[in-house]
């Protein structure tokens, strides 16, 4: 077979196929995660009630239809300072809602934190949304969240960014990229299975490592900028995806981190998670990295390790966000 024919065959898969596979895989990962809940997980989820505090919903932070957040205010409003925990929802950047995390946010509020779930504009074929745009919406929201807490008598002096999957990705971006500009110190980030970087060679789960055209198309959608095949070939795409690559910003704001990843993940590449671990180590971050060797994106096959991860989350919250 001639080189020209090989090249044509190599480029035969349309970009939209790769994008569709990515979205469907993310959705499947989210579904598996939500359906499979071990018994111990009840320790970290609480059904909301007025005994916990006050819930304020759908507070606007911007002009977009999705630019709204829910604020969970603990019943004890007598303390001088409060820690804020923002937990961002999963959904592959295309689905999901802040209400999906009501039990997690209620649990955080029951521990004495001001908790917040933030919606962001989900990508559709019509709006050409991107991870970059979503990360900028989160950056826009944080000062409004803190201001709203202050209006209700809760002075925020520190905060934690957290989330699952896509939400974890956005939480890490804010922590490492934008945290040094936050209204209050970001002292901790935690989450699971969020993509932290975009290296072509890591994304073999979608065949992007073998197809420059599809890789350029996928990364363009994620980054919200045009990335060409030539950019992929000569490596210049790295600068274009840097704004959405949380790992690349750790040196900017090396915040304590607790993360969990499945080695069998077919939604976001585990190779990228290893890059995150290396960066955390290199920057001497106080971190815990939990590797789940039998699990995919839902972390469903390593319950004991998943429990250790959540125990570490509590330990780090107590250490860096003590309720006093």
Regions found by a protein language model. Give the residues of each.
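Alpha/beta-hydrolase superfamily serine-hydrolase fold, recognizing
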Residues: 11-324
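N-terminal Lys/Arg-rich, disordered targeting/topogenic segments
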Residues: 1-13
């Amino acid at each position: 077979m001639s080189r020209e024919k090989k090249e044509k065959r190599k480029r035969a898969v349309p970009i939209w196929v790769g994008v569709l596979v990515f979205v469907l895989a993310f959705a499947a990962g989210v579904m598996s995660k939500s359906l499979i809940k071990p018994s111990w997980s009840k320790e970290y989820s609480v059904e909301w009630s007025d005994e916990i505090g006050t819930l304020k919903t759908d507070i606007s932070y911007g002009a977009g239809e999705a630019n709204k957040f829910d604020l969970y205010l603990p019943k004890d409003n007598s303390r001088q300072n409060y820690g804020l925990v923002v937990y961002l929802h999963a959904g592959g950047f295309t689905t999901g809602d802040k209400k999906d995390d009501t039990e997690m946010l209620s649990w955080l509020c029951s521990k004495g934190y001001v908790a917040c779930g933030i919606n962001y504009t989900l990508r559709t074929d019509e709006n050409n949304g991107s991870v970059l745009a979503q990360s900028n919406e989160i950056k826009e929201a944080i000062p409004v969240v803190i201001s709203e807490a202050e209006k209700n008598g809760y002075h925020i002096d520190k905060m934690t960014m957290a989330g699952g999957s896509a939400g974890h990705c956005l939480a890490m971006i804010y922590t490492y990229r934008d945290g040094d500009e936050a209204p209050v110190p970001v002292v901790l980030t935690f989450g699971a299975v969020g993509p932290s970087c975009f290296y072509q060679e890591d994304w073999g789960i979608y065949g992007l490592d073998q197809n420059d055209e599809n890789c350029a198309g996928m990364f363009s959608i994620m980054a919200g900028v045009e990335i060409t095949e030539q950019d992929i070939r000569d490596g210049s795409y790295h600068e274009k995806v840097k704004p959405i690559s949380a790992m690349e910003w750790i040196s900017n704001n090396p915040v304590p981190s607790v993360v969990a990843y499945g080695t069998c993940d077919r939604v976001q590449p585990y190779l990228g998670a290893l890059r995150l671990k290396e960066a955390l180590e290199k920057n001497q971050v106080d971190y815990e990295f939990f590797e789940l060797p039998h699990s995919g994106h839902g972390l469903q096959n390593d319950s004991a390790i998943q429990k250790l991860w959540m125990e570490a989350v509590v330990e780090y919250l107590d250490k860096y966000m003590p309720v006093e």
